Amino acid sequence: GISSLLHSLRDAGVKLAIASNKYQDGAEKLVRHFFPELDFVMVLGQREGQPIKPDPAIVNQIMQAAHCTDRQKVVYVGDSDVDMQTGANAEVRTIGVTWGFRTREELEGCSPSAVVDTPEQLLKAILG
């Protein structure tokens, strides 16, 4: 599942972060509830005075916190057209997942690097 995927990514040295359009408090509560044992570089949600996705500001803030300047090393994973647009606007690689809000066809319409159907496929798409 997702927890196993995140642990595998962490163990492979991947820095993890969350960019959400949920309100900041809600995003943090969800992460603490479902992934209390994982350290994320940053968990960002909707905040007063900050633009929301698909504005790339949220990705730029996370990259800065992760001390990452190479956009080719960043993968933005999401389940919606807004997520795919956010990654494209931030000029990073995007991967759509089909277990969320949008269909494969809708995600593919946004021209992501890949669209995957399982956490195992996502792990392979990220790590190669």
Question: What residue spans do the PLM features occupy?
Answer:
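Phosphate- and divalent-cation-binding pockets in alpha/beta enzyme and binding domains
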Residues: G26-K29, T86, E106, K124-A125
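A short, structured active-site edge motif that brings together acidic residues
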Residues: E37-I52
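Short, acidic loop-to-helix structural element flanking the phosphoryl-transfer center
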Residues: G1-I18, Q24-R32, P56
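Conserved Lys-Pro-Asp/Glu-containing loop-to-beta segment of HAD-superfamily phosphomonoesterases
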Residues: K53-M84
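Short beta->alpha linker loops
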Residues: G1, K22, P54, D79, ...
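Short helix-capping segments at alpha-helix termini
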Residues: D11-A12, F35-D39, H67-T69
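Acidic, Mg2+-coordinating phosphoryl-transfer loop and its flanking beta/alpha structural elements
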Residues: V75-V116
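Surface-exposed amphipathic alpha-helices with a cationic face
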Residues: S3-D11, M63, M84-N89
